[in-house]
């Protein structure tokens, strides 16, 4: 009994001298303020004793601290007035007040800016916006200025397809974006003119920067979603992580099933020297089924404070199937030429293995070295069956099979040297090798069978250098990238060399940023290339119906773009304007094989050039519980398409689209939201986009101390259809489609201590993207 009493007394004495101090730091709207600095000082001499930072929930703790009566706290965070706290109480809540100040790249006045300019790029401050509690990265990317798309495939208005990066690592699995919680995101960058460290084929980048994580031990995430439109779709994900100071491991599995029912109506108009033809196609309730399974795992090792290496292995299997009937009427002038009915069934699948390894090291205080290596192998098969009959067409069945095998190997080395506090030099090299084999066979029970086999080999070697300097308020980046690209295509059936070419070119880059008082100006100039996809370069033809065939073009040339972009921002109002000149523009052309009866062959070709002017205005504001973001995009395309008789077939009217998103912060973590989007009737390149209006709404809520997140959403309430027209010489294609995107969905996510720290990035980013 006596030893027990002595122990209790010693514990009591110890606790009175070294008591625990804990509390919570709150920011605007009483939201928890993560990563605030909390320092403990002694009284009365103000000697620094110890310090820490708050976690994601705004909580801090000093396990062993001096007596609270003889100390005080100093709490600080960017954008807030520093608070001095005395006396100190345990489990104390400290609320910081927003500051008002101006810096060259940040302006804070009462409330934070969601969108900030950095040169001509946009940096979205997700962690201090309502988007931080919206679900996953895939749920918020399309809500950023100039961005559209879904499910890992995004476009930057006027720039084209965007490559998504998480830190310095390119995302090759789109489903990964549906596994990154928005609460783990610090910022998202919309890079409209990427620098030379990115592939010359990368026209735009969306870069997700995650928060710094400090947690250890076992963590995990379980996410479930289910939606109902005409048909049901669901998604299930599990990810586990285990972290120590030296090792971070992770493993994940996802299963995605998408089922859609799509309505589409097409009308094609073709002018020939003797007749005007029209083909009307009605394709109601085409069923589509997509099944994707992904397993991934990896490890990162912190060898010491200056050296880190890791590896990741991913396996994917996807099965896609769609089928339906097409009722077609062929008109010659005002008369019905033929009625044709066809039933199409398509089944495709692929298996893919991808491995990545990386090394990151620091040499002294000035050098940083990065190495990344990739290997990918994919085997795919696409089978189609088309049963066709008509008033002039005997019943027949066309069976086609496309088989492809991709092998990609790539390496990337980057080095960064800090010349001084105002200047940095980056150099690097990137090499890749791609081998692609495509085998096609077609069987028509009323005609001869067809077959083709193509083997392509591509080699790319690139070196790049970029310098960054700060001269007073002016910041400038200047660099260039030099690429040598060799392509060789061989017809295996006919033992014929189709293509054996080499391309070499410099791709310069210049970017400048200058703040003047509350206004920030940016200017950038870059040159990019868009190489044809492997599918566009195929030498096979696919049967569509009696009157139409599709083909590839192994002789297709790369497309080059020169882009000059200007931007300016005043507080929360941002404006940008860009001019583009595109050489050897790639577009689908429709060629008349036979005039009577009509037969059309569609294939990608190069047009000499076109130019475009793109504008964007973005603004965000918070009024009480209401926070809204609005975005306006306008495009004027200088691209004329003429018929053989000299008449202009497309128009010149600019195209515009606008979004207005509202979020309402209610008590107890309830957040209803309303998303509005509309577009005008206008022309983009060879397309005319018809007017549309979309409305979606929903509500989000956190439960169980923020570990459980739920979102109920209703999408495309009006059931708006997509309507567009594509123009070519003596040809016009009108499409109206309803994609079964009017639905209601429920999303649930449970997270505990889940922090993935993999730093590798893809060396084969361009090659994977072209697949």
Give names to the regions the model predicted.
Residues 39-41, 74-80, 91-130, 149-151, ...:
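Short, acidic, small-residue-rich periplasmic hinge/interaction motif at the N-terminus
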Residues 90-95, 137-140, 174-175, 190, ...:
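N-terminal periplasmic accessory domains that precede
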């Amino acid at each position: 009994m006596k030893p027990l009493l002595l122990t209790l007394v010693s514990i009591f004495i110890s606790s009175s001298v070294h008591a625990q101090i804990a509390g919570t730091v709150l920011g605007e709207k009483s939201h928890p303020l993560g990563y605030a600095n909390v320092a403990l000082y002694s009284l009365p001499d103000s000697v620094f004793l110890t310090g820490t930072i708050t976690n994601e929930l705004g909580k801090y703790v000093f396990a062993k601290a001096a007596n609270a009566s003889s100390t005080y706290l100093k709490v600080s965070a960017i954008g807030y007035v520093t608070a001095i706290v005395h006396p100190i109480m345990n489990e104390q809540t400290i609320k910081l007040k927003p500051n008002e100040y101006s810096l060259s790249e940040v302006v804070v006045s009462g409330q934070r800016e969601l969108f900030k300019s950095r040169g001509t790029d946009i940096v979205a401050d997700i962690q201090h916006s309502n988007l931080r509690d919206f679900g996953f990265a895939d749920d918020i990317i399309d809500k950023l200025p100039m961005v559209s798309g879904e499910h890992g495939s995004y476009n930057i208005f006027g720039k084209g397809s965007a490559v998504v990066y998480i830190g310095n690592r390119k995302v090759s699995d789109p489903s990964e974006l549906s596994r990154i919680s928005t609460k783990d995101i610090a910022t998202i960058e919309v890079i409209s003119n990427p620098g030379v460290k990115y592939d010359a084929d990368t026209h735009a980048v969306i870069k997700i920067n995650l928060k710094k994580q400090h947690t250890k031990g076992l963590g995990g995430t379980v996410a479930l979603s289910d939606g109902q439109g005409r048909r049901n779709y669901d998604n299930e994900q599990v990810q586990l992580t285990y972290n120590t100071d030296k090792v971070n491991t992770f493993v994940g599995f996802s299963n995605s099933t998408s089922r859609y029912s799509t309505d589409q109506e097409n009308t094609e108009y073709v002018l020939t020297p003797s007749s005007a033809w029209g083909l009307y196609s009605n394709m109601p309730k085409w069923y589509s089924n997509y099944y994707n399974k992904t397993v991934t795992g990896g490890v990162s090792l912190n060898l010491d404070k200056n050296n880190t290496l890791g590896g990741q292995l991913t396996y994917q299997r996807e099965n896609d199937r769609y089928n339906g009937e097409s009722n077609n009427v062929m008109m010659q002038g005002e008369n019905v030429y033929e009625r044709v009915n066809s039933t199409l069934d398509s089944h495709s699948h692929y298996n893919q293995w991808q491995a990545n390894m990386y090394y990151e090291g620091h040499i002294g205080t000035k050098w940083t070295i990065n190495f990344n290596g990739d290997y990918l192998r994919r085997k795919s098969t696409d089978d189609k069956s088309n049963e066709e009959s008509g008033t002039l067409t005997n019943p027949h069945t066309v069976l086609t099979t496309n088989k492809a095998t991709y092998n990609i190997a790539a390496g990337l080395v980057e080095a960064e040297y800090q010349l001084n506090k105002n200047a940095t030099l980056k150099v690097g090299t990137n090499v890749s090798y791609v081998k692609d084999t495509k085998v096609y066979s077609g069987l028509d029970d009323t005609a001869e069978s067809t077959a083709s086999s193509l083997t392509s080999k591509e080699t790319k070697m690139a070196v790049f250098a970029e310098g960054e300097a700060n001269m007073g308020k002016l910041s400038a980046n200047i660099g260039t990238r030099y690429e040598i690209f060799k392509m060789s295509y061989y017809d295996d059936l006919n033992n014929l060399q189709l293509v054996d070419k080499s391309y070499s070119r410099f791709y310069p880059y210049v970017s400048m940023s200058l703040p003047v008082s509350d206004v920030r100006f940016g200017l950038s100039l870059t040159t990019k290339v868009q190489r044809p996809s492997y599918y566009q370069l195929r030498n096979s033809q696919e049967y569509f119906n009696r009157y139409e065939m599709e083909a590839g073009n192994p002789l297709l040339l790369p497309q080059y773009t020169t882009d000059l972009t200007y931007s300016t921002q005043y507080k929360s109002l941002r404006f940008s304007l860009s001019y583009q000149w595109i050489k050897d523009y790639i577009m689908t052309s429709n060629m008349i094989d036979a005039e009577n009866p009509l037969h059309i062959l569609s294939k990608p070709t190069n047009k000499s050039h076109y130019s475009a002017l793109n504008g964007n205005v973005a603004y965000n504001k918070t009024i009480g519980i209401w926070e809204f973001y609005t975005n306006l995009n306008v495009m004027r395309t200088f691209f004329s398409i003429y018929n053989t008789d000299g008449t202009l077939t497309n128009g010149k009217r600019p195209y515009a689209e606008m979004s207005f998103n509202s979020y309402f912060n209610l008590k107890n973590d309830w957040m209803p939201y309303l998303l509005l989007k509309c577009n005008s009737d206008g022309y983009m390149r060879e397309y005319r986009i018809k007017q549309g209006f979309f409305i979606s709404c929903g509500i989000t809520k956190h439960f169980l101390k923020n570990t459980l997140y739920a979102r109920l959403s209703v999408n495309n309430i009006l059931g708006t259809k997509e309507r567009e027209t594509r123009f070519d010489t003596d040809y016009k294609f009108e499409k109206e489609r309803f994609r079964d995107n009017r639905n209601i969905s429920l999303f649930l996510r449970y997270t505990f201590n889940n922090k993935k720290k993999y730093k590798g990035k893809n060396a084969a980013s361009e090659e994977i993207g072209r697949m």
